[in-house]
Amino acid sequence: MPPSPPSSAAADQWNIDYVNEDSPLSPRSFSLPPESPQLSTASPIHQRVSRKRQRATSQGLTYNVIRWPLLFFIFFIIYLEFSAYVITRQIVNVFEWLVAWRGYKAKLRKELRKAKTYDEWVNTAKKLDKHLGFDDWKDVEEDSYFDWALVRRVRRTLTRLRAANDTRGLMDALAVCVRANFAGTESVKMYSETFIGTKKAVEAHIKEVAACLDYVRTATDVSLEEKRAFFRAVNKHYGSSALCLSGGASFGYYHFGVIKAFLEADLLPRVITGTSAGGLCAALLCTRTDSELKELLVPELADKITACSDPFTVWFKRFRQTGARFDTIDWARRSMWFTRGSLTFKEAYTKTGRALNISVVPSDRHSPTILLNHLTAPNCLIWSAILASAAVPGILNPVVLMAKDRSGNIKPHNLGGSRFKDGSLREDIPLGSLHTQFNCNFSIVSQTNPHIHLFFFAPRGSVGRPVAHRKGKGWRGGFILSALESYIKLDLSKHFKVIRDLDLMPQILQSDWSGVFLQRFSGDLTLTPRSTIGDWFHILSDPDRPQMKRMLRVGERVAWPALGMVRNRMTVERAILRGRSEVRTALSHDRTSNDPATSLPETNPELTGALDHVPIESDVDAGFVSRSRRARNKTGSKGGDTPEEQLNLAGVFQLDESSKGVRRRKQKKSGMPLVAEPLGELPEVSPTHSPIATESPQRNYTSNFGDSFRHVRAPSLPALSSPFRSIRSNTSSSSNNVQSPSSSQRFRSQLSITRWFGGVSESSSDEEDEDLGGLQSGEATASSGEEGIPTFQLDSAVESHSDRSEDEMLHSGANVKEEYQSEESEGKIPIPGGERVTQEKIDASMASGERLRPAGGSKGSAKTPPVQDGA
């Protein structure tokens, strides 16, 4: 059946080249004329650059004498071990062909490799599982690769709570079990025992978790604030998924097949990263919607890949003149079709909702790798990042990153005009940066680097590719061959580490190549498309339509076995995203959806598959939000999670800027005097007792989340200081009436230390201690007093007065009165507590069974100035 003709929209995608030489955004406009001999910031990607050779630092006579013989000796050992490794791998292949894959299972395996559609592949994989007895392994719940007892207990608990309509109980249970690789359910080993699927107990657990998340999303007995805090917490714990596309020159075009397989299964993650050739594929993915990608991922895509079309005579002459095989300006113009012209990272994220990440390395040897995305470089042009990521020494010269300013003009991304080159030299897969910026806890790596592809060997099987013999429990080629393969590979890594640590490798083309083999090239799930020997002869050539068709098919087939694992992961991840998206929308419109099957809202109906732009959870986003909240608090605007709003004390305390250089808090009301109360009337403090009353019952989840850690207190701290009281009483008798010059500073220090360990609020920060208006620290319970002012009952066993020395407590009344008058003259509002409290009075109060507490509005209480922190 002939393919249907492309639509008009699809035809426009093929015909538009997004290049306008007269436009100020054109790469040609940034280059100097050919006769110009030098580089400037106005022409940052021009290639005619003459560099001065840097003088090498002398390492000593011994280093210079031994360096080269040692380097040649290590490379000779590497050559011998590499030859042994290749021979070992070939012996394993012959063993599997002669012993493991024989008879009917060999026939099924051949059908599996020739499958043209995913449905055909699934049917063949099910036949293989049934023939090899892997279905029995799926039915058995017990297994040593995951905590099956915990998974069964959690699943039963979730089912019972959901049937009982206990929403808050579900939220507490989900907060524990919604974690990345909970109880080993996401382990690669759980998906390496069969050709398709995993244990039925694991799949039932994942379905129950997703159903419970949808139940919490549509529940009506829980406030929106509780839902928002819950989904934010579980999203932080579970994390997000990322698709990482490696480099590999023309081998990187296998990524298009991997992308097509995930696209047709609707399992594309929102975070995409690419390096070198993978950056070109990632740019095409993140600048098109799903419907547009389905029209482009066809063999005709090879017509748009023309970067290596120059004949030998042209590029050889260019290499002698510039030191690079390809022209930067020409590559920039050809790559603009993949990036939709001069799109920036922020514009691409706004259009498709996918976070594009491209890894580049500064030309400086000691500068760290940089991950460019809509957070770190929002205005950077994607085509300049692709050129920098593909700038392999000898292939393409280092490039200056370009960016758009506020007026839409193009300028260098950094003021210094630093140049960047291929990120594969140091960090081909930037997993650390992805976890830090996007909270990515699950990585899907498509690895096509030709120098690394050979070393990927799974001795116990990989996802969707179990070991054929011993019902999946054996070793590939037997234990001896698998052990020999691992030993040789680890020994090769050891030799490369010696070369790197001893700095034996010289710089080739002004680049350090010592760490090329020492990076991490794998992820939680690693896909390695099967290349051919012919690919090595076309490593720097453009593919034609037949080659692109084969690459698309090979990339799809290598991704099909992993779709089951990715689908289970995305089931929970998207259930969390649905909850965050709908709660965010409901907070804006004060409504929620009652349909559990409600799909994610889309900002543009034409963006099929594009998610609502709920911010991807990241520490960078949190930093921006925290900074903006602090700015709003300084300007006095409302909003934000300030300590006053969290404790419902925003109307009680306000900033006092009267003190010089110190931010203080003061009360708006006249305050609460100290009165005595028998100890027997105080409520008993239990380990689960919340020290601060929340605003409403709806905020119980946000306030009590993590009670086991917030209510840890040290009620016996003052008792530890009792041995020192006698010493202080003996030594202070001669200085009872003498005021030390630094007594106020000592009192401030001692009071701060005491309040740090026995703080009133949930946090131990100094800012929240100041929020309590100078009240002495200790275990406190909040209750509503007169005019909405909360009163605090203090535990006398932790009162900070007991930590003060007697020479600071036994001041004369005249000195105290003068101090309070000076405080009033500075404009501070006095609060109760001015009566002088000595150590003898505290001991007498404790002996009589009474304690001191502040009580707002008590009759007959003297309203005297307070003992303020630092007074």
Curated annotation (Swiss-Prot):
Task: Give the compositionally biased regions (Low complexity).
Answer: 23-33, 721-748
Q: What is this protein called?
A: Patatin-like phospholipase domain-containing protein CNBE2340
* Coiled-coil zones: none
Top-level taxon: Eukaryota
Where is the sequence biased in composition, kind Polar residues? Answer: 594-606, 687-706
Q: Which UniProt keywords apply?
A: Hydrolase, Lipid degradation, Lipid metabolism, Membrane, Transmembrane, Transmembrane helix
Query: Which segments show compositional bias classed as Basic and acidic residues?
Result: 798-820
GO BP, sorted A to Z: lipid catabolic process; triglyceride metabolic process
Q: Which GO terms describe its molecular function?
A: triacylglycerol lipase activity
Which major enzyme category is it? hydrolase
Q: Name all PNPLA domain ranges.
A: 243-435
What functional role does this protein have? Answer: Probable lipid hydrolase.
Provide the residue span(s) of the region labelled Disordered. Answer: 20-53, 586-707, 720-748, 760-871
Give Gene Ontology CC terms.
membrane
- E.C. no: 3.1.1.-
* Record-annotated membrane-spanning stretches: 68-88
Q: Where's it found, cell-wise?
A: Membrane
Lineage at the top is: Eukaryota, Fungi, Dikarya, Basidiomycota, Agaricomycotina
Motif residue range(s): GXSXG:
274-278
Q: Which residues form the active site?
A: S276, D422
Q: How does it sit in the membrane?
A: Single-pass membrane protein
- Family to which the UniProt record says this protein belongs: Belongs to the PLPL family.
Q: Name one Pfam family in it.
A: Patatin
